[in-house]
């Protein structure tokens, strides 16, 4: 059986950090995730999903994310229950995050460019940057010095054969594959 959830959204409020009696950090936050379709008025609706993360990644989430920060969460769905003050059984369904990725630069709306992963019962975490498709760097994964020097040597070339041609493109419906 499989229980896997991957979400990308924005925090609806600052994360709440608490510690268990044993001293284990736990952070809770709510992620607003847009639906892939629009309603009858043409507006996108959002789902508000409760998430929980444990140990060192919980402290990092509390320190680096805030209301409005974009984050990616990889984890599993869990339902727990407890007896409420009125004596009735209360059920709570939430996402237990195994990995939280900060999807915005540190100087923007919030967060950092880090990816923190919590193991099942250990305190290991990875601090790599968002180096998608890039070779690893020796500066904690942030690659800013390298990126700045690459941008200085970059010259923009326009390889579009149809750019500024001025002539209309003659394509009939029979030429289209759909």
UniProtKB/Swiss-Prot annotation:
- Function of this protein? Plays an important role in DNA replication, recombination and repair. Binds to ssDNA and to an array of partner proteins to recruit them to their sites of action during DNA metabolism.
**Residues in domain SSB?**
2-104
| Keywords noted in UniProt | DNA damage, DNA recombination, DNA repair, DNA replication, DNA-binding
Q: Where do we find the motif Important for interaction with partner proteins here?
A: 173-178
Per UniProt, subunit arrangement is: Homotetramer.
Composition-biased stretches, type Low complexity, lie in 115-129, 144-160
Q: Name one GO biological process term.
A: DNA recombination
What organism does this protein naturally occur in?
Listeria monocytogenes serovar 1/2a (strain ATCC BAA-679 / EGD-e)
Question: What CDD domains has UniProt attached to this entry?
Answer: SSB_OBF
- The primary gene name is ssb1
Q: Mind telling me which Pfam families this protein's record contains?
A: SSB
Q: What are the recorded GO MF terms, alphabetically?
A: enzyme activator activity; single-stranded DNA binding
Question: Which domain of life, per UniProt?
Answer: Bacteria
Region: Disordered, residue numbers = 103-178
Name this polypeptide is given? Single-stranded DNA-binding protein 1
UniProt xrefs under HAMAP family = SSB
Q: Under the cellular component aspect of Gene Ontology, which terms does the record hold?
A: nucleoid
């Amino acid at each position: 059986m499989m229980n896997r959830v991957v979400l990308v959204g924005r925090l609806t409020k600052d994360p709440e950090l608490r510690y268990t009696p044993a001293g284990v950090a736990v952070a809770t936050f709510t992620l607003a995730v847009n639906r892939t379709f629009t309603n009858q008025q043409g507006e996108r609706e959002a789902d508000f999903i409760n998430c929980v993360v444990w140990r060192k990644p919980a402290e990092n989430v509390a320190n680096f994310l805030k209301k409005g920060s974009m984050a990616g969460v990889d984890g599993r769905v869990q339902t727990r229950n407890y007896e409420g003050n009125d004596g009735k059984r209360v059920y709570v369904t939430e996402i237990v995050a195994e990995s939280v990725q900060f999807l915005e630069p540190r100087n923007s709306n919030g967060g950092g460019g880090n990816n923190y992963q919590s193991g099942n019962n250990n305190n290991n975490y990875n601090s790599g940057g968002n180096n998608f498709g890039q070779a690893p760097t020796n500066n904690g994964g942030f690659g800013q010095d390298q990126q700045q020097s690459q941008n200085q040597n970059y010259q923009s070339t326009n390889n579009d054969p149809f750019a500024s041609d001025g002539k209309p493109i003659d394509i009939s419906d029979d030429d289209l594959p759909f």
